[in-house]
Amino acid sequence: MVSPRKGKRIRMLKKNDIIQVAISDLSHEGAGVAKHDGFVFFVDNALPEEVIDMRVLKVNKNSGFGKVEAYHYLSSARNADVNLTYLRTGIADLGHLTYEDQLTFKKKQVQDSLYKIAGISDVTVESTIGMTEPLAYRNKAQVPVRRVNGQLETGFFRKHSHDLIPISDYYIQDKEIDRLINFTRDLLRRFDIKPYDETEQTGLLRNIVVRRGHYSGEMMLVLVTTRPKVFRVDQVIEKIVEAFPAVVSIIQNINDKNTNAIFGKDFKTLYGKDTITDSMLGNNYAISAQSFYQVNTVMAEKLYQTAIAFSDLSKDDIVIDAYSGIGTIGLSFAKTVKAVYGVEVIEAAVRDAQQNAALNGITNAYFVADTAEHAMATWAKDGIKPSVILVDPPRKGLTESFIQASVAMGPQKITYVSCNPATMARDIKRYQELGYKLAKVQPVDLFPQTHHVECVVLLIKE
């Protein structure tokens, strides 16, 4: 192989080679980027401006992966206090970067996606809205249970593996959730509960899931087991509720499949209610074990407030809430508009949305179980003319058929809430081709200490 440097031959790198490199950038997943003799390497726990000795882990045709062996120069943006366990598991894959620089990184992710994918550089991307206290914010935890060193342990898997690293302080989870996980772990050890063995397909307890209402403080504990028959449930419940009076719901889920999915189909309420209750922007919500509910309540409120402000609605306006879930965004809009029409393909979520509307005395929000494309076609035939279509899709973004159907409704505005800048930029490009102009872009940090970024954008019909 001949180096780009004229006339100089270089040795092909192989696994376990150690080379000195300078980190020039961060990938969209927060890995350090190093360039060496035509190769691009991705290195965890490495920041721009740092100079490191890198051990080669894998080499592909033009790229590879490495790990830090030694640092020669550290970035001033490095957070030296972070526990490396949070990086190894991916719990906090940006925890080694100062929070101010995390917010800058996330703004850049949005800018880069808009420019590289949609060719947009003339619209201002606002500074990322961040948290005052960017730790211990998650209101939900899902932790695997495995045997480590002969005993039942809870924690997180090492990245790209199913090797459990025991953890007691999860860094970004509500501290009461951490306490309940640790108490349950210790209690089930005393009852000699067998943890799940993924290789042998043996054992009883697969996962512990905990939800906590940010404002209500109510807690739900879900024990995911491989079979219906379990341990001495009454004794376990008694001790948990005695230690944690805020626990108002204990549920068993049975998952007997060889799968990475956390939940199986069957749920059984062992104690208390089927749901917990919490509030967001003044509305109350009943939250089940399966409900999609934003894990960062404080920042979800800021996200929704941004979407409401961008939409700039009045009492005469009609809003279509596509991907309406359990109604959190749509019901937040309902107070300021004539009507909200929500559509969601998951029937259980639609029932939750309808119940949440009733719970809050909201009578101008209507939710249906359907595809958005079919629902919008039906509403158009019924003469419903939305001022705004609100979209909050999964990471894969919008389908072409959805984009076409939404444009056919002729809304003056489309407010797009995104959890993936790349698919957002792709969809914006398509909307621009169909007569909509990008007007506003606001990143919001719902997931501090991680590379994930949410964004609200406003598209206006030209």
Curated annotation (Swiss-Prot):
Keywords: Methyltransferase, S-adenosyl-L-methionine, Transferase
Main EC class the enzyme belongs to: transferase
Pfam families registered for this protein in UniProt: TRAM, tRNA_U5-meth_tr
Residue positions binding S-adenosyl-L-methionine: 294, 323, 344, 392
EC numbers on record: 2.1.1.-
Domain TRAM as annotated: residue spans: 12-70
Species, as recorded: Streptococcus pyogenes serotype M1
Domain of life: Bacteria
Name the record gives this protein: Uncharacterized RNA methyltransferase SPy_1346/M5005_Spy1098
Entry annotation: catalytic residues: 419
UniProt GO molecular function: rRNA (uridine-C5-)-methyltransferase activity
GO biological process, alphabetically ordered: rRNA base methylation
UniProt similarity note: Belongs to the class I-like SAM-binding methyltransferase superfamily. RNA M5U methyltransferase family.
